[in-house]
Amino acid sequence: IAIVACGTAYHAGMVGKYALESLTRLPVWVDLSSEFRYRNPLVSRDTLVIAVSQSGETADTLAAVREAKKKGATIVSVCNVVGSSLTRESNFVFYTLAGPEIGVASTKAYTAQLLMFYMLALEIGRIRKTLPSGFYAQALKTLNRLPILQSQVLKKKKLVEAIAQRHHHFGSFLFLGRNVNYPSALEGALKLKEISYIPAEGYAAGEMKHGPIALIDEYRAVVCIAVAS
């Protein structure tokens, strides 16, 4: 399985890789759409290419899909806009149907893309019998609780405002995450740059000691994503 996407959708694809490999035991790689077609990728009739785009009109992703189709790959798109160019180029389509993104940044579409990847991984894992006993039913219950959990997070607006007030003066930010939280670190850095115009980087937590630590000082804030430990 190959996943191609740009920007926020690329980060969703990275999470998708973790989910698909973990639950289906199939090899998955993720490529930036803008790089995919320039390296003569190893794609064949046995390759499933999953193209992710909120709008379905991302030029680089469309070009990557056309390159994969030339090589005989089957194309599945994860898209938010019905009837967009990407969906017309695809063999199969998963519509996220998250509604239009009002701001520049992709937010609810990103969340829907993550959910779509987990659902796909669960279904393939169920068919391939690679899931632990009882995992499928428990995972569906957990996913169905997401709207409640998200609403609880949104109620923390005052806490978020207080944290922003304490940290808005920092000149740059470093976001750190490990495993499935690494793409979230990249996404957090992208969102801060996109919306607040503050320089930010996302790194795998274990890589901090291999360079980025040299830039840590009193002018740089560090955000650690450690949701379970």
Could you tell me what each predicted segment is?
Residues 219, 228-229:
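NAD(P)-dependent dehydrogenase/reductase Rossmann-like domain
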Residues 2-145, 225-228:
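Glycine-rich phosphate-binding loops that contact phosphosugars or nucleotide phosphates
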Residues 2, 82, 92-221:
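Active-site phosphate/pyrophosphate-binding segments
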